[in-house]
Amino acid sequence: MIRLGRVAVLLVCVLAFLGQGPPASTQRLGAKIWVGRYQEIEEYLRTAECVRAEIFGPDKPTRCTLRPGGLVGRMVWRSLKPGVYRGFRESYKAEIAAYEVDKLLTMDMVPPSVERQLEGNTGAAQLWVENVSGLKENPSPGESNRADWENQLARMTMFDNLIGYRDRSLGNMLRDAEWNLILLDHSRAFGTATELPRKMNRIDQGFWSKIESLTRNQLDAALRAWLADNEIQAILDRREKMRTEIKSLPR
């Protein structure tokens, strides 16, 4: 037994030296501090004290600094009531719904978002992701990260089509030092339109399998607090159009 134990330790050391340790998904969380801690971070966002608030950006969301020493340092809060703004249907509830769909698909690109009251108003509180960069100055990684990055972009396109999100731009995409993609600003997502916002030139087959496995019961349980019945049905209708388009892609 002792000899076997020593062999096992030696094997672990050799694999680590060769770079064949645990799967990359367990090594490259980077700025995604919420992965595997969804419920506790969601609850913290609902209840943590906001010790300093500042309004920023063109849409004037509120960035809250939370009491030091907690699970999360900052959050962003938007009180966008359901309605039409500048010609677009928007709602803070869509921010939460996008996170819930992300969770169903274990995509881990949309930061935790929950409903919360702040100064008597109800809105969406979302984890403020630290240590990230925008993509406008540096939109693509080096060769070593390129294949994984392209797979992430393919999943993003599939996700946007599923939730009917037409407003994707470099301005609402972030990445951390590990080139993990993080997606923001989904207040214009969902709705009842079933046209696909973006053309899919490639897909992530594993991610498509997750999308295909979604059921109406799963969507109802996760989204009925945030979306109307016809908006939930539109997700399934868009999935059918995705299926048709995917079948036409070259193999």
Located regions from the model:
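Bacterial N-terminal signal peptides that target proteins for export
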Residues: M1-V9
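Conserved ATP-binding subdomain of kinase catalytic cores across diverse folds
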Residues: E43-S144, N161, Y165
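Bacterial N-terminal signal peptides
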Residues: A8-G19
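ATP-dependent phospho-/nucleotidyl transfer catalytic cores
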Residues: E119-L162, M200-G206, K210-Q233, R239-E240
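Canonical protein kinase catalytic loop motif
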Residues: S169-L170
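C-terminal catalytic region of ATP-dependent kinase domains
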Residues: R67, E90, D176-R251
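Boundary at the C-terminal end of the N-terminal hydrophobic targeting segment
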Residues: Q20-T26
